[in-house]
Amino acid sequence: MRYVVFRLTHELKKRTGWFEKQFPIQPIHQDYISLEAWRHAQIPFFLQAMPARPYASLPVKTIDPPACLEGRIKFFNAVDKALGLDYDWLTHPLTGYRYSNKVHWSKVNDFSAEAGDIKYVWEKSRFAYLYEVIRYDAQHDTDHSEWIFNEILSWINANPVNAGPNYKCSQEMSLRLLNWTFALQYYKNSEHLTPELFSTIQYAMYWQAKHVFDNIHFSRIAVRNNHAITETLALYIIGSLYPQFPQAATWKSKGKRWFEAEIAYQVYEDGTFLQFSMNYHRVVVQLLTWAIAIADGLGELFQEVVYDRAYKSLQFLYAAQNDETGWLPNYGSNDGALFFPLNGCDFNDFRPQLNALHVMLTGHALYENGPWVEDAWWFRASLNGRKAMAPLERKMGWQVFTKGGYAILRDAETISFIRCGSHKDRPAQADNLHLDVWIGEQNVLHDAGSYQYNTTPDLVKYFMGTSSHNTVMLGHHDQMLKGSRFIWYH
C-alpha cells in the first residue's frame, strides 16, 4: 500500500508542476565555504592519510596515457566511444539524439524510443573515467588536475541545476558527487583549483546533494535497490565532508540511519543480495568500503549489522569465485557498472573489490599479492581499531545460502552454482534452477547476461526471461508471467 500511495503522489506532483517548484532550475549562486578555508579544514577523507608505501611499490603494470585525455571513453566497462574533447554531455552517442538542458528534469522522458537508452548519456557524466587519470598521475608523478577541473567545469556549464537528463536520476548525482570529491581531495592543493572554480564546483555539489535528499524516498520506496544504498551513503558522506553546506548535519544523520536500514534490508542474513545479481552485489561491496573508510576517518561506527552484512557478503561472493581468474558467475543483471575503477584488472575480476573490503574488516589480504591489492591501497584499508573479523578461508564441498536461494558445490577443479529458491523481493529474471559450471578457469555453462534495459521487447524477453539461462522451460514459456519493465508477477 505504501508503494502504491507513493507512486500516485509522485505522479501527481510531476503532473501538477510541484517538482518544478520544489526543485528550481539554476537557483541563485551562493558560496558556502572558501577554497582557503576548505583546504585548511581537517576533513576526514581517507586519501589524506599518508600511504604506508608509495604507489610505485604496488605490483601494478605501467599505466598507459588514459584514452579519455583524447576524448575516448569506455562505456559500461566494455566498449570504447570516441566522444571527442568537446562533448556536450547531452547527446546520445548511438542515436545522436540531443536532450535539452532547458527542460526541467521531471519532464525528461528517460524511456524514449527516439532518444535511446538514457544510460548512454549518463555514462560519462558519472565521471568514473577520472580514476584512469588519477591512477596515471599517481604512478608517473604527473599532474592532470587542470584537465580534470576543466571537465568538471564543462559539465557544470552544460547542465544547469535541476534541468536536463543528468538531473533525472539521484543515483547518478550521488556517484558524480563521490567521484568529484575523490578528485578534489587528490588535487586539493593544485594551482589550477582557483577560488572562482571552487566556488562554482561547491555550488553545483550542494544543489545535487540537496536534490538527492529532497527526492530520497523515490529510491527508498519506489526502487529499493542499490540506488537507495548509493544515495543514502552519498548523503552521509557529503554531509560529513562538507559541514558548511546548509542541512549538512541533517544529511549526515539521516543518511547514516537510512544507509544502515538499507543494508539491513537489502543484504540478507546469509550475505546474499535482494537484486539477485553478482555485479550489483559488487557495487554494494564498493559502497560498503567507502562507508567504512569514511566512518573510520570520522571516528564513527555504524550499527553492527552493517559490518555483519559486509562480512557475510564477502563469504557469499568468495564462495562463488573462480580462484584462477577472480571471476564469478555472470549471474543476474549486469549493466557493466563499476562505480570506482581503482585498478587495472579485468572488469570481471572481483578480487580488487573483495580484497579491499576484506582488509577493512579483518586486517588481512584475501589473496596473495597481485594487481588486485590496489583498491585497498587507495582506501588506506585497515581495521582502524575496530574488532577484527576472522579472515576467510577457501571451503570445499557444499555451501547453501538459504535466504538468497543458492547452492554452491566446489572441489579442487570445479565449481557448480545453482539458483534454487523463492523470491522475498521482486526478481529481475525468470531463472530458477539456473546452473553455472566452471572447470578450471573455464565457465563452461553460464548465464547469457542482461544486455540493455531499454531495448526491443524480444531482447528484453530473451535476456530477462528463461531462454537465456541453463534451466527448464515448457516450450517457449517463461517460468513467470512478465509484467512491464523489470516486473515479474508470479
Each model region followed by its residue ranges:
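Carbohydrate-active enzyme catalytic cores, enriched for enzymes
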Residues: T272-Q275, N279-V444
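Low-complexity, Ser/Thr/Pro/Gly-enriched N-terminal "stalk/linker" regions
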Residues: A67-K107
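Aromatic-lined, polymer-binding surfaces characteristic
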Residues: N101-A310
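Pocket-edge structural micro-motifs
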Residues: T91-P93, Y131, R410-D411, R419-C420, ...
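Short alpha-helix boundary/capping segments
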Residues: W122, K168, M173, D425, ...
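Membrane-proximal basic amphipathic "stem/tether" segments
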Residues: M1-H40
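Active-site rim segments in enzyme catalytic domains, especially the processed small/beta chain
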Residues: D431-H490
